[in-house]
Amino acid sequence: MASSSLFLLGALLVLASWQAIVAYDPSPLQDFCVADMNSPVRVNGFACKNPMDVSSEDFFNAAKFDMPRNTFNKLGSNVTNLNVMEFPGLNTLGISLARIDYAPMGVNPPHIHPRATELLTVLEGTLYVGFVTSNPNKLFSKVVCKGDVFVFPKAMIHFQMNLDHDKPAVAQSALSSQNPGVITIASAVFGSQPPISDDVLTKAFQVEKKLIDWLQSQFWENNY
């Protein structure tokens, strides 16, 4: 009996640990917690608005996700985020959205979302998409068309590119965090402020110092 009890206790501890590991955002402990953006309280997320002051408008956002965005930039893409910063009703719900517009041959460059898995749906056009795993860095990529869905696992480097030379493309992403965050690899490495030592980058990328200096001198434009 004692051994059975110990086995059960061990199994419960493993299950509890597993649940803690796989959880991205903390699970809500109440029906909702609309973010109070003016609260002086600092927590992991946002303090709750008084439930008595919450209305239907707190769960609505006129995002205009049906409207094309301006893709006139070096990357030829535009990401419109709808996370807790724009939509306080998402607080504690563990979800956010993004609309991604691509100019012909536009690219959403390699980046990561440190706090979220991303589920991308192609609304218009044809995209080349992919992600790279942790070491030894295997690439999983595919050409996806209108109506197709592709998932990028949490914190993996991933990208999308519009393959059409003449037509724009549009996608929409659901992300498993109210605030997924984004780190664009190229601009993070070569455009950080203050800059990373060129000695570090020269050795890391195994190229000449003048190439690193040139890369660091560029204007690294974002698409969001």
Curated annotation (Swiss-Prot):
Keywords: Apoplast, Disulfide bond, Glycoprotein, Manganese, Metal-binding, Secreted, Signal. Gene3D superfamilies: Jelly Rolls. Residues 1-23 form the signal peptide. PROSITE patterns: GERMIN. It comes from the Eukaryota. SUPFAM superfamilies: RmlC-like cupins. Residues 60-213 form the Cupin type-1 domain. Oligomer (believed to be a pentamer but probably hexamer). This is Germin-like protein 8-12. It comes from Oryza sativa subsp. japonica (Rice).
